[in-house]
Amino acid sequence: FSDMERIAEEGYYEMVNMRLSKCGGFRNSLKMIDYLRDHGISFQVGCQLGESGLLSAAGRALSLLCSDAVYYDGSYDEFLLQENVTLEHVSFGPGGEAGPLKGHGLGVEISHRNLERLRDPSTAVTMSRP
């Protein structure tokens, strides 16, 4: 969050690219966006290149909460990924149109078969309850 404060204090930025995956999730993203709004700094809802359908769906939800964003970026998964971890395609439609996704939560279901096949076992973390 200190980056946002520095950006506001220095006054060098007219717009900030807000990426849900870089900001620590919904709560932090919305907190930072509110801070930008309070300081008169424009923002766009951005994305990471090659996001899966799950992150695209999350970005879509954030975009729908931020009608004052200057630009919306994301939902490229169908155009960039050979395989996805979601059952639904969440890529934008003709003219870049992308509205709310139907269904519960983020509006997507995970393909457990694809997730298992696409995961990188070398990065797996084992967690146990205390």
Question: Which role fits each region the language model picked out?
Answer:
Residues 1-97:
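Shared catalytic-loop signature of beta/alpha-barrel
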Residues 79-130:
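C-terminal extensions of enzymes
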